[in-house]
Amino acid sequence: MVGRYRPSGYVLVSILLIRGSKKRCPDLKKEVKIENLFATPRGLAMSTVAGWDKVKGPVETAYTLPPSCYFSPDIYTSERKRIFSGGWVSFGRAEDLGNAGEYFASTVSDTPLVAVRGDDGEIRVFANTCRHRGMQLLSEGRGCVRQIACPFHGWGYALDGALTATPRMKSSIDFNKSDFGLIQISSAVREGFIFVNLDGAAGSVDDWLSGFSDLHQPWNLEALRTASQREFRVRCNWKLFLEVFNEYYHLKKVHPGTFGSLYRDPDPPEPVTGCFVSQFGEHVKKGSVGVLEKDHNELPLLPGLTGRLSNGTRYSWVYPNLSFAASRDALWMLEVTPIDPTETQVRMRLMFDADVMQSRGFAAKLATYEERMKIGMAEDIVVLEAQQIGVSSQFARQGRFCPELEPSVHAFQEWYAERMSAVS
């Protein structure tokens, strides 16, 4: 979805008129000129933004993030450095790059990158920029190449990034191909997920994911395979999108007729030291929450799940941009890329056991899982886009959490506040 165009300096203000009568009040929307109403002062250090300290501490006493975190261009600029360049960011799945030459091109922090499987079987991530004059080498998306060829002047690169072709460059003095290979980005593959670190200074990915593999071992994440995926845009800040996927508070209100009553209250978040949060919750009834109750067309239990894990779902959020729900029969994965402060690109996958995907009748059953996710996502998007309007108001203030049903959101916001408010 593409956001509606508005001239610079204009914002959409929703005004609700209320008076003491039984008549329904109109919802009036109009465009008004408001100069610099929501701006964070240029050059303001993030450590001085009011409200960070109120986010930190126990969920029972903590406040939510300052509303400006969801729309301020200056905070968004700081996020690009502190959150998306300075940490490990999810960048697709290794299963998409099964053969030599297969690649995935996208952006992180507005930086074009490409992940490619080499002839040696290794996955490497490069800046998607020609070393000649900066041309983007590969268009966003997936494909397969024997070599990476620049569409501008024909420079060519091997799958390991080495410069191999330089037409008409023989007369250049002191020009060595070995000095102009593609710039390699720090990357790692863990549990089938590809992670990248732009500034190369985030430390070990295993420290970032400390405890992640052990906690998710029963689901064998690396062995799961994608059966369905799609991309779409939502007119809300990237944090709002991932927050709603990691809290139970909205379920009965937003999803009353679909799956709002399928979950019991979740366990408290797991005590972890890595940069992620995870909660497990049992299902009210025995069976899948991946299909609507009317379908009764669920797939078999994932191998390795026993006891409580065989009838529940683990919601995990790997900071900053990867979240998934690992359930008894399937995994729903969401990976986000911020477009700007108020628009988000989402890559959504449905993943299953590889053997189950080869079973008879799988395609028909997959359709019921897709329908459930489609309906649920549509219900969420309605409130997310309305939340973006509300949180952008000059009257929006920091709120409070429901300790039992929003602790994962608080955990992320506390982590975010620590990184954003750190003195650099």
Task: Give the label of every model feature segment.
Residues 52-67, 222:
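Short, contiguous pre-domain boundary segments
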Residues 65-109, 113:
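Non-catalytic accessory segments flanking enzyme active sites
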Residues 31-56, 368-371:
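General detector of N-terminal leader/presequence modules that precede the first folded domain
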Residues 29-33, 96-200, 206-214:
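Rieske [2Fe-2S] iron-sulfur-binding domain
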Residues 116, 122, 128, 188, ...:
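C-terminal catalytic domain of Rieske-type non-heme iron oxygenases
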Residues 16-19:
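Short, low-complexity, charge-dense intrinsically disordered segments
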